[in-house]
Amino acid sequence: MNQVKLIALIFVFFLGSSFSRKNEAHDIHVSKCNIDFSNEEKTLQITMHIYLDDLEADIAKGGVTEKLHLLTEKEHADGDKFLLEYFQKKFRLQVNQKDVSYNFLGKEITEDLLGGWFYLEVENVQELKELKINYEILTDLYNDQQSVIKIKGSNKKKGYFLLNSKKKEANVTF
């Protein structure tokens, strides 16, 4: 039953984003995160899709008073610094029961201009046996925030999770 709900939520998310326009607000509060283990590169490659208005509102709620204008011509000079600080506070990982840090690789705007793709990477992951995710992105902003987490680990094993303001953690054993 949970898989049916997850598939329906993903469908609504993609359908809604394909008809969005720049000036329209969105009523659904969903972010998504893909985490892929690269055995060849010994890295975790992380891709997140987050709506920009929500992201900037949550960063401001955390105490940043400057308007960031992320992924626009007027982007704040320290936009990437504020993003990394936000991600470090709201997105934590443990690999094989050890806390890991990640590098912020970059960002790009989505086709509908409402969201952004954000790229992170954890280096020196020799083997992936266990992954613990703490994902609190936007969960303090909206009670109905949903986060779809897709993980591809060793031997192409996949895991799908739906996290929200009540359930912020997921554990996967490979």
What spans do the regions from the language model cover?
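Bacterial Sec-dependent N-terminal signal peptides
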Residues: M1-H26
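N-terminal soluble domains immediately following signal/targeting peptides that reside
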Residues: N23-F174
